[in-house]
């Protein structure tokens, strides 16, 4: 018996290449930044959600796509109104980190330590970095806006690593710390 799909996804073109977005009926569950090819991007989707189906986006997903496309074209979009579905696999601490990270406006940055303070765990800068390294919804949860205290980029787990992080910050006109 084949498992019923609980996620849908689609690819969409942006200024930096084809991104992918997955969703449930409750909200966006994942965003993937461009891989080398659309086939590689699809393969990443299926690694995370093996039973997902590619389909036309629901209205809230179309709204998310429009926001991501605009942001990646340099428009200062704050994507806090997009519903998210964390499912049951995202730990509570990570959710708190993601909630704080969503408040960082385009063109601005915070340090890992500043995010830790805002989640009420001032000594948890490394744990913040680990949570952001597992962020399943980049751009909507703008982990690229969180930097090391010394002004360095810190890490970035999306394709292209820190070069992609710097590209996203440049698109937004952000100044490094």
Feature roles, as predicted:
Residues 43, 126, 166:
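Active-site phosphate/pyrophosphate- and oxyanion-stabilizing loops and adjacent acidic/basic residues
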Residues 140:
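Major-groove DNA-recognition helix of helix-turn-helix-type DNA-binding domains
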Residues 1-122, 171-177:
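Basic nucleic-acid-binding alpha-helical/helix-turn surface characteristic of O6-alkylguanine DNA
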Residues 149-177:
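…primarily DNA-binding HTH/wHTH and HhH modules…
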Residues 124-135:
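Regulatory, non-catalytic segments
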Residues 143:
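Short cysteine clusters
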């Amino acid at each position: 018996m084949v498992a019923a799909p609980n996620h849908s996804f689609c690819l969409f073109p942006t200024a930096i290449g084809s991104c992918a977005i997955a969703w449930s009926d409750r909200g966006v569950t994942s965003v993937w930044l461009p891989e080398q090819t659309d086939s590689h991007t699809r393969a990443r989707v299926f690694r995370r959600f093996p039973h997902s189906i590619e389909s036309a986006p629901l209205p809230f997903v179309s709204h998310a796509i429009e926001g991501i496309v605009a942001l990646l074209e340099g428009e200062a979009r704050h994507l806090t109104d997009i519903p998210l579905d964390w499912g049951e696999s995202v730990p509570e601490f990570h959710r708190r980190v993601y909630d704080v990270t969503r408040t960082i406006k385009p063109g601005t940055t915070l340090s890992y330590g500043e995010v830790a303070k805002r989640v009420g765990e001032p000594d948890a800068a490394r744990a913040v970095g680990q949570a952001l390294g597992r962020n399943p919804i980049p751009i909507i949860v703008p982990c690229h806006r969180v930097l090391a205290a010394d002004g360095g980029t810190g890490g970035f787990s999306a394709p292209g690593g820190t070069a992609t992080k710097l590209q996203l910050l440049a698109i937004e006109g952000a100044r490094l710390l």
